[in-house]
Amino acid sequence: NLLFGQGTRGLQRYAKRGYGVDLTATEAERARTAFFRAYPGLSRWQAETRRHAERVGQVRTSGGRVRALEGQRALATESLNTPIQGGAAECLLAALAELNLDRWNAHLVNVVHDELVVECDPEPAGAVAAEVERAMVAGFLALFPEGGTRDLVEAHRGPNWAAAKG
C-alpha cells in the first residue's frame, strides 16, 4: 500500500484486487498525489528512511529492533515496511503487557495483527472493552509518547468475532 512505497501500478492492482475498482494510470497517480498531499510528512519520512537504510544497510523499529537489509528489493520495500509493521507489533506487545482482565473473568483468546480478541460474559462487556481500549492506547503511547490518540482504538462487541467485526 501507499505507506510502504507502493507505486502507481501497484495502486491500480490493489484497487482492482481489493475493491474491484479499475483505475487508469492517471487516476491512480492522482490518488497517490492527493494522498501524499494530505500527509506531507509521510513522503518525507519515506525518503529519509530509505536514504538511511541505503547508507547503513539496516532499519530499526520504534522499539529498537534491527533488521538487516540486503538487495535493492529489501531497500525499496522492507525499509518502509519494517518500521511500520514492527512498530505496530511492538505497540501490541506493550498493550498485552498493560491488559488486565482478571476482575471480569475475561480471557484473551486471540491476537490477530492489530486486534485483541477477548471473551467475557455479556454483563461486563462494556467495561472489558474499555479496558482493552485503555491498554491498547497505553501500548501505543509506550512507544510513541507524543503520538495522538484520537480515534486510535475502537473496540467492537458481539456474540462472536465475526459479528464484532461487523
Question: Model segments located where?
Answer:
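Conserved catalytic core of nucleotide polymerization and phosphodiester-bond processing enzymes
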Residues: 1-166
